[in-house]
Regions:
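Active-site-proximal segment of zinc-dependent metalloprotease catalytic domains
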Residues: 1-118
Length: 190
């Protein structure tokens, strides 16, 4: 993996993505698995240069050369952030775009509703039937206990809401996209 200390201002995710795409292209040409999705973390310089995350596109079909980037740092004033880093949920959201995921439109007025098929009210993980929940397996080595996230109080990673987790809807769509990418790059059958 190459390291490139790129310094960008607040609205230059396009430059970050161009550099990430160049790194990806170089690595793919050197034998890296072409199904590999690339995401760049851009340090916010202690809040002085916050860069909005951005994917280079939202592909309709398998296209793992779509890259994305987003900020990392300690959030100052982000409601709902529980772990002192917004790199985790920002990364999940922008990578979701590289797998063809759109916004469910929640909170209203804060994001476009470009995924009209999103099945759960208010960008939640489940409807009132509570059929789905989020589950974090934790990490005993880091002292992180497993936990269950309520499907009606937690929101899908493609929203701009707090308390994010991946919904069954988004999970299944990304799982299918991964299968499609596997098929796209499968070796020819003799």
């Amino acid at each position: 993996m190459l390291w490139s200390p790129l310094v960008v201002g607040g609205a230059t995710a396009v430059l970050a993505n161009a550099q990430i795409a160049a790194i990806r292209n170089s690595e793919i040409n050197s034998g890296t698995d072409p199904r590999t999705h690339y995401y760049g973390l851009v340090d916010d310089a202690n809040g002085q240069h916050f860069m909005r995350g951005r994917a280079s596109g939202i592909p309709a079909g398998p296209q793992p050369d779509t890259v994305a980037s987003g900020p990392c740092g300690i959030p100052a004033g982000f409601a709902g952030d529980q772990d002192q880093s917004y790199a985790d949920w920002y990364g999940a959201h922008e990578l979701g775009h590289t797998y063809g995921r759109f916004h469910p439109g929640f909170p209203p007025g804060a994001q476009d509703a470009s995924d009209p098929a999103f099945p759960y009210a208010n960008g939640q993980l489940s409807n009132a039937d509570r059929k789905y929940v989020g589950y974090d397996v934790g990490d005993p080595q880091l002292g992180l206990e497993p936990k269950v996230m309520s499907g009606t109080t937690h929101h899908d990673v493609m929203t701009y809401a707090d308390r994010q987790w991946v919904s069954a809807y988004t999970f299944e769509a990304i799982r299918q996209r991964l299968a499609d990418e596997d098929a796209q790059f499968a070796p020819p059958v003799a």
